[in-house]
Amino acid sequence: MANPVVAIVGRPNVGKSTIFNRLAGERISIVEDTPGVTRDRIYARTEWLGHPFNLIDTGGIDIGDEPFLTQITEQAEIAIEEADVIIFVVSVKEGVTDADEKVARILYRTDKPVVLAVNKVDNPELRADIYDFYSLGFGEPIPVAGTHGIGTGDLLDKIIKEFPKDATNEEDDSIKFSFIGRPNVGKSSLVNAILGENRVIVSNIEGTTRDAIDTRFETEDGTKYTMIDTAGIRKKGKVYENTEKYSVLRAMRAIDRSDVVCVVLNAEEGIREQDKHVAGYAHEAGRAIVIVVNKWDTLKKDNKTMSDFENLIRQEFQYLSYAPIVFVSAKTKQRLDKLPELIKRVNDNHEQRISSAVLNDVVMDAIAHNPTPTDNGKRLRIYYATQVAIKPPTFVIFVNDPELMHFSYERFLENQIREAFDFEGTPIHIIERRRK
């Protein structure tokens, strides 16, 4: 199951971004940013009381130079389409406005839960004014002050109560993968070419997200795959359909539901900032990753073209040094037959478990060749290591003092583990814990 999505909507100047930053910052944990991922985020991966979810500020979705009421409408429609829970933000300072009522009328169309947050209630005298907002028809308003963090705990408690229950627990042994990338990199062509080349049986199944249709197929060796649909709002002609931020949001949904993410680049156009945004999100989410360079047939090539492009990728995506790169053409089918096999291999690595005995042999051998660092005369001591999770493989190393583990030595240990075991295509996480 993908993490639930919570969208923040409301007219301008009610404090949506302040509430977004508050919920995504001090009161709840947020997965650390990877350099080069994104600058002005409209989404955050967060959690509250052990419930992970994705938070979206629809106000950050740029819909061009349209009248602001039109923008509100379209942002609310995005929330209705994408979210599991909607936070409707209003301001106690202005009371109920015509624009608030317009947003409310749009939200009446959905059967998704709407939590009404009355912002800017920064002193007790204003609390009596929140009852005016009952007229909007969304039940009890929750008073908050985004700037000061007042009421955010109550708001979060209400939100997680509204999360959908897992609809199914049935086992699915297929490998779930998706093609992500900015518009015009050739994702649709790749999907069609892969299905045309490799399918033995194909069925369309209801996706867990809105009107998405996932496609299952099986290759001749019996491996089952589910291709995750990345389609979002299917309203042709909408200005926001191809905006950068909306396509990032669409990719985020697919990444959360995938085991393996194929980051698609356009060989003709090289690497753009948005390529880094979506790849960085997949990395932060701990997914297995394959970098797919599409439209390779369109380039004039010499004997250095491929190595030069690979070097560029390694330079621009330094945090994806573990990800294999494949150069393909959806049009000519060049190397497409290799892709399902590569997806399976990185998925196997993503699920790989290493026995503690073998792992500790590697770690102790690494220490013997490169002794642990010291700080102010105190040496880091590593007692033992064990794998505690898969997808991604996660290792806990028990030490005398976690503060003594320098990031460069942790990187050294990661490299030694990667050399000893095949973890191509998957991030690995290392956690230091003090031995009790």
Curated annotation (Swiss-Prot):
Binding-site residues, GTP 1: 10-17, 57-61, 119-122
CDD domains in UniProt: EngA1 (cd01894), EngA2 (cd01895)
KH-like domain location: 352-436
InterPro entries: G_ENGA (IPR031166), GTP-bd (IPR006073), GTPase_Der (IPR016484), KH_dom-like (IPR032859), KH_dom-like_a/b (IPR015946), P-loop_NTPase (IPR027417), Small_GTP-bd (IPR005225)
Protein's UniProt keywords contain GTP-binding: yes
Domain of life of the native organism: Bacteria
Residue ranges of domain EngA-type G in the record: 4-167, 175-351
One Pfam family in the UniProt entry: MMR_HSR1
PANTHER family (UniProt xref): GTPASE DER (PTHR43834:SF6)
Family: Belongs to the TRAFAC class TrmE-Era-EngA-EngB-Septin-like GTPase superfamily. EngA (Der) GTPase family.
NCBIfam families: GTPase_EngA (TIGR03594), small_GTP (TIGR00231)
Function: GTPase that plays an essential role in the late steps of ribosome biogenesis.
Protein name: GTPase Der
Organism the protein comes from: Ligilactobacillus salivarius (strain UCC118) (Lactobacillus salivarius)
Gene: der
